[in-house]
Amino acid sequence: MRPSLRRPSAARGFAYKAAQSLTRPRMEEFVLVRHGESEGNIAFNRSVAGDHSLYSGAFLERHSSFWRLSDRGREQAAATGEWMRAHMDVNFDAHFSSEYLRAMETAALLELPSARWRPEVMLRERDWGEYDLASQEERRNAFEQYEARRRRESLFWAPPGGESLAQVVQRIDNVLLYCNRRFGGQRVIFVCHGELMWAFRLRLERFSGLVYREMQADPRPGERINNCQVITYSRRDPETGALENDFRFMRSLCPWDPSASYTGWRRLDRGSTL
């Protein structure tokens, strides 16, 4: 009798993957750091306040990957590195950074001991397509129909020519799968971008699109991802030292602004099985 060539059902397939994940190697812990304040952050924030003047001249002639840190951004990165060296184990087994200049500058300014940073294209900023160099005024006027869809579709919305946050989550899946296999039982640090960190949160904390929309509409101080926000996911219980199968423990803090931090570790009831 010839074996069946039928595919297993979706439910059965997911169950098989979940069973496999219980024995799959995983990192013990990983840390995410958002880059410091950049030229683009300044231009965007001023535009939100009604001043669109920075969206002109040489600023529009460069791709956003070439935006540098501002003076304040460099101070934020240096302060974050100082805090990390004083309050965390900074002896990581692998160091990854987005290829964007603002992330690589931030990584260098952390001054982590023996760090050998690897630029990684999968950690690039979310692709904003035609929105990339558009002021708030242009977004309201030229992209009015897309703004309406953005409010309605939340994380499933993609700017014209760009990525939805749901698509960024798929990139994060690849990063996690690779690093879990390559650095099983080890500690890894990633310096990247705010949208990437939201994608990590969506995957690791497994909150729904509805919850994400609520958090974006009225974010609590500890839920924001500020410049140089530091988010840690760990399988090791910070109180008992016991090692869990999944990433069950999370901490989010902003070294240069304590008001944007949680008061300690949180246990995730729906830790990732990646």
Explain the meaning of each model-derived region:
Residues E39-R68, L110-D173, D218-N226, E244-F249, ...:
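Phosphate-handling substructures
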Residues R2-F30, E39, A43, R126-E138, ...:
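Acidic, low-complexity terminal tails and accessory targeting/binding regions
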Residues W83, L109-P113, Y178, R182, ...:
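Active-site catalytic microenvironments for nucleophilic, acid-base chemistry
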